[in-house]
A protein has these predicted regions:
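Short, low-complexity disordered leader/linker segments with a strong preference
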Residues: 1-32, 111, 420-430
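Hinge/lid segment of periplasmic solute-binding proteins
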Residues: 26, 92-147, 179, 210, ...
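Long, aromatic- and glycine/proline-rich binding clefts that accommodate carbohydrate-like moieties
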Residues: 27, 31, 37, 295-296, ...
Length: 430
């Protein structure tokens, strides 16, 4: 894992002790409203929010809903003269839209005033969900690094290793390329009489988040990020879509074309699939002894190939928040050393680098040992004003190929002009 060190003094500045009672006056007679996604990190915040409520004599209202509903619910509030939400959690591919629309407040003056050192964060996450064009608008909250979730009990079994050697003529090692991985996943499903893959092909976000891994793995991208000309007509894009389509047809669980990440988690929890190219944040669900059959049987491996997809969420203050000082106190508290560490131990996905070197954390979540490598070999969607439209456009391409059976090369070639239009005149890409 790449080392991201910060001085102890800097760490204590960011991660200081609980606020004094005097500081709590800024939240007096105020409630904090936050809209969040139904994921383990939201649960981790909910489990400790009473500490802030007690220290600041206030109430934190967390409204947790399905991701697909969040954007449409946030936009009317953010567009109003006075909004309902005091704190925002911003998905990485909303960053460009929210910044361009002026919906999130710049934090640099507050950071300087309170001597907050953002150097404790993994740099890639700070660039993805922290700064935009050199100014800070967010503090990274949690990431959704992706890679291969797999059944270690099956893959490590001598019988599997022997069968693999007989099939492929070599000793077992984790595949080095996406093409090799796809062949192994198809073979393993037949070998074990299971689904080789658990997949999420639902439009728009699930299939795009999943398939973007395939695109990045084979060296493709949506654009040449120097010229901002679309590269979706290149051979790499067709290769990625073809591999994805092949696995969806020949290795995935029934109904995968309409599945989301909850369905992937359920397929894995029920012990019905060997592999998934999916989110690390699913592990707390897979470790839930109440309804998972794969407790302590799953492990994580970085995606084979060149790069994987990296997404993240950041804490932000709405520009129309009624009490920005109280909102800022919440951001400082929730990203304090104590709160961030408690969230991590509770199954959250930490953004502060020091946590990944903590022995207690790694003992509780051993699959997180390879997160540093995964983050260092990943990238996010471009920070652009029309990133939501980018996702919709790629989802349209994938739907045409996966559902309608169109040839990927032709569909992708036709999409190039659509992708080019999305970046035309974008102020964030100058």
């Amino acid at each position: 894992m790449r080392k991201h060190y910060c001085s102890l003094a800097a760490l204590l500045l960011l991660c200081g002790a609980a606020p004094s009672l005097a500081a709590s006056d800024v939240c007096k007679d105020t409630e904090i409203n936050i809209l969040m996604e139904t994921v383990p990190d939201t649960v981790a915040v909910s489990n400790i929010k009473s500490e802030f409520e007690k220290a600041y004599n206030t109430k934190v209202n967390i409204e947790a809903i399905n991701y697909s509903l969040m954007h449409e619910k946030l936009v009317p509030s953010l567009s109003a003269s006075s909004g309902h939400y005091n704190v925002l959690v911003v998905d990485s591919y909303w960053v460009g839209e929210f910044k361009t629309a002026g919906w999130i407040a710049e934090l640099d003056e507050l950071i300087a005033r309170d001597k907050i050192d953002t150097g404790v964060y993994i740099p890639a996450l700070m660039e993805l969900n922290g700064r935009v064009q050199g100014k800070t608008y967010m503090l990274p909250f949690w990431h959704y690094a992706m890679g291969v979730l797999y059944r270690k009990d099956i893959v490590d079994a001598p019988a599997f290793r022997e069968a693999y050697k007989k099939q492929f003529g070599k000793d077992w090692e984790f595949p080095k390329t996406l093409e090799e991985f796809a062949e192994v996943a198809k073979w393993a499903g037949k070998q074990e009489n299971m689904h080789g893959m658990a997949m999420a092909g639902q439009r728009a976000d699930p299939v795009v988040m999943e398939a973007t891994n395939y695109l990045f793995s084979v060296g493709g991208d949506f654009y040449d990020r120097a010229t901002w000309k679309s590269t979706m007509g290149n051979p790499e894009a067709a290769k990625a879509v073809n591999i994805y389509a092949d696995l969806l047809k020949n290795a995935a669980q029934p109904g995968a074309l309409g599945a989301n990440f909850d369905d992937v988690a359920n397929t894995l929890k029920q012990g019905k699939a060997i592999f998934a190219i999916s989110y690390l944040f699913l592990f707390p669900t897979l470790q839930d002894k109440k309804d998972s059959l794969v407790v302590d049987k799953m492990m994580f491996e970085p995606l084979p190939g060149k790069e994987s997809f990296l997404g993240a969420w950041g804490w932000a203050i709405p520009s129309n928040a009624p009490n920005k000082e109280c909102s800022w106190e919440f951001l400082k508290w929730v990203e304090s050393k104590d709160a961030a560490y408690k969230r991590a131990l509770d199954g959250g996905q930490p953004t502060q680098a020091w946590i990944y070197e903590d022995s207690k954390f790694l003992e509780a979540w051993p699959m997180m040992r390879k997160v540093g490598y995964a983050v260092d070999h990943s990238k996010g969607l471009p920070i652009m004003s029309r990133s939501t439209q980018l996702v919709e456009t790629f989802a349209e391409v994938l739907g045409t190929v996966l559902a309608d059976g169109a040839k990927s090369e032709d569909t992708l070639a036709e999409s190039v002009s659509k992708f080019d239009r999305l970046v035309k005149g974008d102020p964030l890409l100058k």
